[in-house]
Amino acid sequence: MIAMSNMDDELEEIRKRRLAEIQRQQAQQQPSDVQAAYQQEQARAEMEAQKQAILRQILTPEARERLTTLKMSRPALGEQLEMQLISLAQSGRLKAQIDDEQLKTLLMRMQPKKRKTSITRV
């Protein structure tokens, strides 16, 4: 019985040391994870600010309003349109600000043609 008791005590001691080691490792990793997440969030916010600054330069207020509305209803399409507009601006293919009508035209070109399907009963 005494031998079993010693083994149980040793096993318990090993478990405690291992648990303490794991907790120590997690405590060391946690600040770096938090810091990395903070830096990533900062970079994302900075990129978003740059994107908004470019869009302010190339879109009229009405077009910006339409783009904002589009992003609320269809985020993927709004992001795609933003990236296309920024690409056009950076490549120098935009000569003047894009107004609401031009933005509508660009949106129509981006969206695939919808087929009209009708069901008729015979």
Swiss-Prot record:
Residues 22-42 are annotated as: Disordered. GO terms for cellular component: cytosol. The keyword Zinc-finger does not apply. Keywords: DNA-binding. InterPro entries: DNA_bind_arc (IPR022889), PDCD5-like (IPR002836), PDCD5-like_sf (IPR036883). One of its GO terms (molecular function) is DNA binding. This is DNA-binding protein MA_4116. Belongs to the PDCD5 family. It comes from Methanosarcina acetivorans (strain ATCC 35395 / DSM 2834 / JCM 12185 / C2A).
